[in-house]
Each structure stands twice: as structure tokens, then as C-alpha cells.
Amino acid sequence: MAPPRKLHIKSYGCQMNVYDAQRMVDVLAPEGFVETASVDDADLVILNTCHIREKASEKVFSELGRLRLARDEASRDGRRMQIVVAGCVAQAEGDEIVRRQPAVDVVVGPQSYHHLPRLLAQAAQTGRALETEFPIADKFGFLPQPQPEAIRARGISAFVTVQEGCDKFCTFCVVPYTRGAEVSRPVAAILADVERLADHGVRELTLIGQNVNAYHGDGPDGRPWTLGRLLQRLAAVPGIVRLRYSTSHPNDVDDDLIAAHRDLDALMPFVHLPVQSGSDRILAAMNRKHTAADYRRVIDRFRAVRPEIAFSSDFIVGFPGETDADFEATLALVTQIGYAGAYSFKYSPRPGTPAAEMPEMVPAAVMDERLERLQQVIDAQQSAFNRAAIGRTVDVLFERAGRKPGQIVGRTAYLQPAHVFPPAGMAPDSLVGQILPVRVDSLERYSLLGELAATPPRHARPLAATGA
């Protein structure tokens, strides 16, 4: 029997890329590949790229330069290393990658990685393989199921893609061009995946999609199901104790999703709901198709049915034409909502997007100053939210042993890491997969520290009360 070939994947960007990287491993496992943490002994290296941030492609080319040296070293040792560029940079700039970096064997877009075995064989024969077309048939029907040992090795939490692509065409965003139009998987296919994951130890699911709450997959009744209805069904799968979803668009929050948050204890009271700006003028320029007031009303709908719910968001500062008044409107919105955390970025033009051609680019120094001010407010809110847990008892789903001997690590409903030393005689590994009450004693940066409690947890105070 031939020895296994070693595969190293370096993944950038979003949760979808994390999921895609795992599925690439599943695709290549029948071909005899096993994962390795090191590039140096890899027979195959895959860069699973992201195109969202500025200079994404240049970072890829820089990494490819380093990989070319590793490939040369492998060749001197008598080994052949193949190099693959996958993901959204591959989709957007495949021809440029082929032109600039001859060391690359395969360039494959995010809708075609189920063809990796064929593409690798083609590259071995002809020297190069490129596939970045959007296929007629979606890839999910062709992906092999992960092996039980792979599921267990990935832990008790898992991502499941239910929707892919986006039809919103925000003027700053490349996703519609790199991931394509919105496609939703059938309910039956998702349910089969989830039941298999649960059978092999998964306890927490995060349903993912570029615009996940636009989900409209075919249901067993022959009608399209909403995300809320899908969540209701998945909450009934034995073994699944927590459900999450990401990333959402405010315009696609419907009655079914609100009802799911009202009715399902398994659906965590923590929602990532990007808004990008608090200025109606900038929101219109971004083609977001909602106002700041619309966004606040969506937040209010969630809080009306789940008072303990918390939110995170995304913000862009320095969008073309953003004035001081526009930025102050963003600060005002952040203060009004009160977030458990948020991600803030300086605007970076993405080639091929409408915003990249807009006039009135904001000076870099102004963007830097605005980003710092916004991040200070966000950090203060996150600190206040975390401090509010001190002295309280919260539910923690334990995931793995901690870095310190005898320590166990899990996460709260709000994704806060929680570090606990179980009582003497209780093995930390025995707690993995269990939800147990933890009394929070203190904080360490963004983590909660505490001890197992005998009393059941209380609901956290609604986040609106902790806004900075």
C-alpha cells in the first residue's frame, strides 16, 4: 500500500472558507491525502483565499513566492509538491495568477473544488489546470461525506453551509462576482448532513452563507423553506443542543426568523447583523437598501421576543464621500444599539466594484482617525458586556482541554470563551460536549474565568443596558 500523501491547507477570511477547507480535505481523503500542519513535508499545499480586504491578491502572490522556495527545496529532496490556489482570489484573478506565478499547478474557484482530484491529475499531466467558471450544477451534490474520524477530530462544533452567493450587490463588495448568485441547499440534504454530524458527536451547529437569512431551500413539502423554518426542524435533531447562523442581512429578517428566536431555546441569543454605516446617505451609496432606522427596527424586533439577545456587526469607515457628519451618524448608531462586539474596517476599493470608481476618496489619515475612534467605542461596549457577566452564572458548552493542566475551555451563548478548572477528581475531558453552569469570577482579556456552579444560570441582562 502506498504511503499517504500529505496535504497542507492555509485558509484566509470568513467562516465559509473554514468550511470549504474542511470539505477540500474530505474531497481529497479518498485520494490518499492526510492533513499536515507543516508546509515543509507537504505533497500538496492549498491556499484557500479571500478577496474581501485590500491587497488580498498581493498577499497571495507574496505567499506563493515563499511556497515556490519550499517547492524547490522539496524537489531537491526528490519530492514533488503541488500548489493550488483556491477561493475567491482564484475566482477573481485566476488568469493573473497563471500569468504571474508559474509555480502554481491548479487554480480553482470556490464553486469547483469538488473537482480537485481531476484537476490535480490534469496538472500532473499537462503542468497546469484552471477552473473558475460557475458550474451549472452546484457542488454540494458531489461532495463526499466526511469520515466519522474526521468529524470527531474537528470537535463538537461544526459549520454547515446552507446557502451560498449573494444577490444584494452592495457597491463595495466582490462576493456576488466571486461566489455567484444566491443558491440554497435543499432541506433534506442539510438535514442528512446535520444528522450525520450529530451521530458522531457534534453538539453545536453554525449555519453559514454569504446571506444566510435569504435561505429559501426546497422543503420536503415541495415548497421553499425560510431559515426560521429550517432552524425549527434542525432544533429537533437529537444531540444538537445549540444552533447559530451567520452572516445575515437586515432586509432578510422575516417573521419566521423572529419566531425561531422566540420559540427555540437551542437557537443562541447572539446575532451577527452587519450594518456597515449609520448614515442614510452612505447606506444609499453602498446600495444597502435600508436606512439606519430600518436597522434599528430590526434590532427592536429581535429584542421584543428575546430580551437577552446580543448583537455583533460590521462597519466600514472612510467609504467614498463619507463626511464628518456621516461618521458621527455611525458613532450614534453604535451608541444607540450597544454591541457585544463588532468588526470595523477602513474602506478598501475592490477592483470591479462600483465603489472603486466613486469620486471623493477619503484621505488615509482621516480613515485612520475615524477607525480609531469607532474602535474605542466598540471596545468599550465589548468590555462592558463582558464585565456584566462577573458574578453571574452562565451556561457554557465545553469544547476542549485548556492550555493549562487541568483546565477546560468552552463558550457561552454569546461566544465568549470561558476557562474553568473542574473540581479535583473530575477529568476535564469528561466535560467535553456538556453544557454546564459556570459562575463567572473574573475576566482575562476577552475570556471569562470561573468555576462550575451548582445553580442554574440566569439570563444575561439585555445588551441595550450595557451600551457605552
Curated annotation (Swiss-Prot):
[4Fe-4S] cluster 2 binds at residues 166, 170, 173. It is an enzyme of class 2 (transferase). Its main location: cytoplasm. This is tRNA-2-methylthio-N(6)-dimethylallyladenosine synthase. HAMAP family: tRNA_metthiotr_MiaB. Binds 2 [4Fe-4S] clusters. One cluster is coordinated with 3 cysteines and an exchangeable S-adenosyl-L-methionine. It is found in: Cytoplasm. It catalyses: N(6)-dimethylallyladenosine(37) in tRNA + (sulfur carrier)-SH + AH2 + 2 S-adenosyl-L-methionine = 2-methylsulfanyl-N(6)-dimethylallyladenosine(37) in tRNA + (sulfur carrier)-H + 5'-deoxyadenosine + L-methionine + A + S-adenosyl-L-homocysteine + 2 H(+). Its cofactor is [4Fe-4S] cluster. The keyword Transmembrane does not apply. Monomer. SMART domains: Elp3.
